[in-house]
Amino acid sequence: PPYSIVWVYPKGTKSQIKSRIRELDALGVEGISFQGELQVDTISILGKGYAGIVVLGKMGRKKVAVKIRRNDSPRKNLEKEAVLLKIINKHKIGPKLIASSKNFLVMEYLDGEKVGDWVDGLKKNGNSSQLKLIIKKVLEDCYSLDRIGLDHGELSNLSKHVIVGKKTTIIDFESSSMDRKVSNVTSATQAFCIGSRISKIIGRVYKIPKKQKMITVLRRYKHEGTRESFENLLAVLKL
């Protein structure tokens, strides 16, 4: 069947496909529906990274996001990502992990749009107070991640890694690590405010401080990592 590629993307055997379908059944996922803005072959999906692809699933009456490990992934399983998700979920960050196995993560489905698209929609007369709330929420979550020593790893390309909706949160923790220096707050602040595509749009909606001032407060935060130096950053950003 044409959809079978999804289970073993980019390619795999019939027995691998059968085994993965059984594995997903065992997690309690009752159905998959192929929709979303991305495509593999001609199949619509929610997301695609180098470790997995994400599709929409159903558990009872609940929509879920199902991450399927890519067959060509250097990772032998998704267990490390599941462990990290459990840790950040305790701090109310990320999509809630519902179930996991070797090749699957079942997470709450977050209805919303990627922050890059959301910012695009603001145009010139966007709502600056709403924008500030979103930036503050993301930076607060980044501060929490810094405190627990978990580095997201991809926040310099923020546009794709935050969902804005009823629940605004950071997503895609497949490159995360607790074994390297954290730079969540600095990466996200730079993405929002310094020289990225979205920073140009944000700059039209509300006045971002001068680059040199930003670099100074970020340096202080990087050096101290304290709540006070973080509050100082928020104050400079007028958040």
Predicted regions span which residues?
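Juxta-kinase regulatory segment immediately upstream of eukaryotic protein kinase catalytic domains
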Residues: 1-43, 233-238
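ATP-binding glycine-rich loop module of kinase domains
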Residues: 28-80, 86
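Active-site beta-strand termini and strand-to-loop segments that position acidic
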Residues: 56-60, 108-109, 164-166
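A conserved alpha-helical element in kinase catalytic cores
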Residues: 67-101, 133, 192, 196
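Conserved structural core of kinase catalytic domains
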Residues: 93-135
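Protein kinase catalytic-loop region centered on the HRD/HxD motif
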Residues: 140-151
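C-lobe/activation-segment region of protein kinase-like
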Residues: 150-154, 165-239
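Hydrophobic residue at the +6 position relative to the catalytic HRD Asp in the kinase catalytic loop
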Residues: 158-164
